[in-house]
UniProtKB/Swiss-Prot annotation:
<keyword id="KW-0472">Membrane</keyword>
<keyword id="KW-0375">Hydrogen ion transport</keyword>
<comment type="subunit">
    <text>F-type ATPases have 2 components, CF(1) - the catalytic core - and CF(0) - the membrane proton channel. CF(1) has five subunits: alpha(3), beta(3), gamma(1), delta(1), epsilon(1). CF(0) has three main subunits: a, b and c.</text>
</comment>
<keyword id="KW-0066">ATP synthesis</keyword>
<dbReference type="GO" id="GO:0005524">
    <property type="term" value="F:ATP binding"/>
</dbReference>
<keyword id="KW-0139">CF(1)</keyword>
<comment type="similarity">
    <text>Belongs to the ATPase gamma chain family.</text>
</comment>
<dbReference type="GO" id="GO:0031676">
    <property type="term" value="C:plasma membrane-derived thylakoid membrane"/>
</dbReference>
<protein>
    <recommendedName>
        <fullName>ATP synthase gamma chain</fullName>
    </recommendedName>
</protein>
<keyword id="KW-0793">Thylakoid</keyword>
<dbReference type="GO" id="GO:0045259">
    <property type="term" value="C:proton-transporting ATP synthase complex"/>
</dbReference>
<dbReference type="Pfam" id="PF00231">
    <property type="entry name" value="ATP-synt"/>
</dbReference>
<dbReference type="InterPro" id="IPR000131">
    <property type="entry name" value="ATP_synth_F1_gsu"/>
</dbReference>
<dbReference type="InterPro" id="IPR035968">
    <property type="entry name" value="ATP_synth_F1_ATPase_gsu"/>
</dbReference>
<keyword id="KW-0406">Ion transport</keyword>
<dbReference type="InterPro" id="IPR023632">
    <property type="entry name" value="ATP_synth_F1_gsu_CS"/>
</dbReference>
<keyword id="KW-0813">Transport</keyword>
């Protein structure tokens, strides 16, 4: 016969665990909203910066401008910026990014191209350091919602590698925020910058909304109308110098948005994982409660039978 106290203790333990997973789910949901608000808050600056860069690039289209960040050269070495989280309990979020990064290193090796890793997040650092991958820098302990200063610090490291010609291309591997139950690791080229990319093609903004007591994500396509600068605009400095100064800022801004989206993906994955854990705990509590009631009923029945048997024996 099952031990009633053991079942009762197990039910209590699972209920306590469910309280923790439910609290973590609610915290993750609140932080996803904060990540969304950060993206929305930086949107006007990003749009204006893209407008100025596009206008300058259009103005200089027929000039022989020397812009190192736009210069393409034969690729011998690639820097891979791999973005994961510092913590677990987020489903397959970290594993999927690490797997995609490993696949990319194998693709580069097959092409005879060297690579080095710049890692954001403790999980990826632990994985690749343990396996002796070439690592240039590791950034961990970042704020859960990345800040502009953190993105700028990472961007400066990437700029240093690219401008010193230590690497010929910089690629970003991060998780694109698709929905609360879906995320997709993607590979994106950061350097050299593509002038055509200044038109914000395929750009999207995500919004976390509530419908019928459930959280869902709406994605909104961004269509940027980037007019050319007025032809009679007079620059106090050389337009080439202005563009050369703004391109690092544009890179930092693009990196910040990618880090924010990766953070939102991690939080959404954690929210989903904790929601599943809470549901599983509730199911297990129901099963154990049923087992407890059956065992208790069997114990009561057994006691009644023993009392009846004892009474019969005394006759």
């Amino acid at each position: 016969m099952p031990n009633l106290k053991a079942i009762r203790d197990r039910i209590k333990t699972i209920k306590d665990t469910r309280k923790i997973t439910e609290a973590m789910r609610l915290v993750a949901a609140a932080k996803v909203r904060r990540a969304q608000e950060q993206v929305m808050a930086s949107r006007p600056f990003a749009d204006r910066l893209a407008q100025v860069l596009y206008g300058l690039q259009t103005r200089l289209r027929f000039e022989d401008a020397n812009l190192p960040l736009l210069a393409k050269r034969p690729v011998k070495t690639v820097a891979l910026l791999v973005v994961t989280g510092d913590r677990g309990l987020c489903g397959g979020y970290n594993t999927n990014v690490i797997r995609r990064a490993k696949e990319r290193t194998e693709e580069l090796e097959a092409e005879g191209i060297k690579y080095t890793l710049v890692i954001v997040g403790r999980k990826a650092a632990q994985y690749f350091q343990r396996r002796d991958y070439p690592i240039d820098a590791v950034y961990s302990g970042l704020e859960q919602i990345p800040s502009a200063s953190e993105a700028g610090q990472i961007a400066n490291e990437l700029l240093s590698l690219f401008l010193s010609e230590t690497v010929d291309r910089v690629e970003l591997i991060y998780t694109k925020f698709v929905s609360l139950i879906s995320s997709k690791p993607v590979v994106q080229t950061l350097l050299p910058l593509d002038p055509q990319g200044l038109e914000a093609a395929d750009d999207e903004i995500f919004r976390l909304t509530t419908r019928a007591s459930h959280l869902e994500v709406n994605r909104e396509k961004v269509t940027s109308n980037l007019p050319a600068l007025p032809p009679d605009m007079i620059f106090e400095q050389d337009p080439v110098q202005i563009l050369d100064a703004l391109l690092p800022l544009y890179l930092s801004n693009q990196l910040l948005r990618a880090l924010q989206e990766a953070a939102a993906s991690e939080l959404a994955a954690r929210m989903t994982a904790m929601n599943n854990a809470s549901d599983n705990a509730q199911t297990l509590i129901g099963t154990l409660t049923l087992s407890y009631n059956k065992a208790r009923q069997a114990a009561i029945t057994q006691e009644i039978l023993e009392v009846v048997a004892g009474a019969e024996a005394l006759r």
